[in-house]
Amino acid sequence: MKQDLTWGWAFGCVAALAIQAALMVLVAPWFAGWVHRLAGRLVGEPRFPAGGRWQEIWHQFRRPSLYGRQDGLNGIFCALALVLAVLACGLVPVFTLTMPGFPAPGMLLVCTILVAVGVLLDLPQAVQEASAAQQGCAAIVADALLLPVLTPVLLLTGAHDLVAFLGRLHVLSPITEGAPYVLAGVALFLATALARRDEQTASATLSGPDRAMWLLAADCMQMCWVTLAADVAWAGSLAMPGESGAENWLTQCVEGMGLWMFKLLVASFMLAVLRMALLPAGRRARVRLGAIFLLGVLAWQVTSSHVAAPSAEPENHNVEDENTQGYSTEPAPEGEPS
């Protein structure tokens, strides 16, 4: 039995959102370091341990910044990117949804914030000179086109917010009714899987806290895309507050956290394999945008066909009623022809 939104449940939802945001920010550099190390193992190259990413970020935070003539706005770009990335970490569900009636963002808002983070991360390279600026501008165009390409995926949510949309998918099986949403999740996953920023080039002009904020924002953005894709592909792992008591909800949260770690493990192997593909930046951007759009269109068409199919049944029943309207199923009286 579903419960109404009370002050106790509202406080629990706020605490869950804060824990989820902090968990994603803490795990994001570890996840990026693990993917980097795993990709190196697949190609036979020695890489730093997974915890080396946090060590690099902490080391850069303690270093002084070295500014050039074009580096005056880099600190603002990196700070804004980090703020938006942390905000996105608080908007993407990790192990639980919020109560119905609790304020929740829409899929369009979450994707817009993540695209804005990607554009801000490209700006430090775009303000440089010569070929570095060209690569940065090309990256900005590729990231800016990501939001229109995601239109078919955004159409699946309709007018619902993200929590209501995932709550509707919670009861669907990923193999049968939820298969189109698995395609939508794969499309969201490709948004980060085929991005593959060259960190050494994109952040080459950054140093000190600016570089640390850039690295942390990039890791948080990657974590948000991966988690959002996993939620859309399999929303059944998320806890549903209000359906039972608080104790059962806390148990579901612990289970959801374990399933989230499992989904991250699967995503890390997929990212490591995809990063072995050697494609030029321009071709990789075209493949990325094309694959996301085609998967989104396919998922939207399959979902539309499933929704339109049941609507034809009442018409058939009406036709049968019209055909049988002049006939009576009662037995005829004795002496009268039936």
Regions found by a protein language model. Name each.
Residues 2-338:
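Alpha-helical transmembrane segments of multi-pass membrane proteins predominantly involved
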